[in-house]
Amino acid sequence: MTFISQTKEADVVFIGGGIMSATLGAMIRQIQPDWSVVVFEQLNELGQESSGPWNNAGTGHSALCELNYTPAAKDGSVEASKALAINEQFQLSRQFWSHMVDKQFIGSPKNFINTVPHMSFVMGKDHTDFLRTRYEALKPNPLFSSMEFSSDPSQIEKWAPLVMKGRSGNGPVAATRAAEGTDVDFGQLTKELVGYLGNNDAEINYGTTVTDIQRGTDKRWHLKLKHKASGEHGAIKARFVFIGSGGGALHLLQRSGIPQGKGYGGFPVSGQFFRCTNEEIAAQHSAKVYGQASVGAPPMSVPHLDTRYVGGKKSLLFGPYAGFSTNFLKSGSLWDLPLSIRPSNIYPMAAAGLHNLGLTKYLVSEVLKTRSSKVTAMQEYFPQADGNDWELITAGQRVQIMKKDRKQGGILQFGTEVITSSDGSIGALLGASPGASTAVPIMLELLQRCFPREFKLQWQDQLKDMIPTLGTKLNDNAELAAATMARTAATLQLD
């Protein structure tokens, strides 16, 4: 009996069975149904790394509550452009998911997306002034028109009782609330999308690692494979390869040898969350409440108290608490970081490290935190929290991008970046948040860069069938924005 794939050649090979590969695969299956598709996942189940429901916070990132997307300028004003762009991107994802549900390509939307209001909550005069300014900057925009603001503790308590009950002191507080926020189980969504692929002639392989990738003289990518359990080796050739293996993408990008991948490094950041599955406590909270990151802390460290829906059950999550590990994946190796160092990236990585000593200091302080101090931090947002009701869980690894920079030599970049070869035969995704929430626009960008001719001349009708407002900014058209959000809300059964 053989365990390794016997397929010798494919039009498209996906490395990694997470939300990015699943999204791109579902798109390609509809715009180019004649292409052969093969997926390789190194674990025995899909979406078990960063896409897994407990490896991320499940926030449908649309900049409704994430304060780091709206930085304050020196004059006190708020820059809203990034928030608008992220919300536009999330609307594209909602449209694609809605299309997949409407066509019955995937199952009930309740399995992967639920309405959970998004809130921002701040304390102290400076922060409440900032939040009001942010609200005033966002509210006039069609994509944020439903947002509410309050500095009345009694109103905030109605929105989020656990945040206000037992709160001591008379200092000012403020909150915004967007009722249309969502909680997304990206692990389940990944399984739904890959299930659609498998039902439509794609070959899905589990427990298989891609150990090497090289460009052949036949202009095909030659991949070496290893089945982890049996130890069997194999090989496959592909016309197009997408490296969507999360933190594992950097190593394979480096092995591909494409010039566009040189100079990139990875900075792994681990994290933990508190999880509460006590139904009585979970029933008292229905929101994702985001605060502000501590001074010197990275954007992904913003504290938040979240309602989660996983496997049909409601629970609560608080965090994150940052940490450091040299693994690039939860299932990876402590050698991941040192083995990623190359002559082409050692200087950018060193320069980025020197420019981010504050981040290093922050991570060290987080690693040294006791469980008791972590509970105390949670009580800033849930004053009556009892640590005995909460379980500390390890989140997925986040590998932030380090890259060349003309001025500083190297920078640490938060967010995601698409890397493609000059001929469009291979693409990879590096980085993290907002990540999964914007998988659809990210994969659209990759399609446009790797297949510019087909994207422009052949695929527009199919793409607009999936995403009707593709190429249009919803925020510039209030009527279209309202209609689109109402349509996708109905299809996705969002209350």
Swiss-Prot record:
Substrates-to-products reaction catalysed: (S)-malate + a quinone = a quinol + oxaloacetate
Keywords, ordered alphabetically: FAD, Flavoprotein, Oxidoreductase, Tricarboxylic acid cycle
Protein's recorded name: Probable malate:quinone oxidoreductase
Enzyme Commission number(s) from the entry: 1.1.5.4
Gene name linked to the record: mqo
InterPro entries for this protein: FAD/NAD-bd_sf, MQO
Cofactor: FAD
Pfam entry (one): Mqo
A Gene Ontology BP annotation from the UniProt entry: tricarboxylic acid cycle
Listed pathway(s): Carbohydrate metabolism; tricarboxylic acid cycle; oxaloacetate from (S)-malate (quinone route): step 1/1
Main enzyme class: oxidoreductase
Lineage summary: Bacteria, Bacillati, Actinomycetota, Actinomycetes, Micrococcales
MF GO annotations: 2-hydroxyglutarate dehydrogenase activity; L-malate dehydrogenase (quinone) activity
Organism annotation: Renibacterium salmoninarum (strain ATCC 33209 / DSM 20767 / JCM 11484 / NBRC 15589 / NCIMB 2235)
Family listed: Belongs to the MQO family.
Stretches of the chain forming a coiled coil according to its record: none
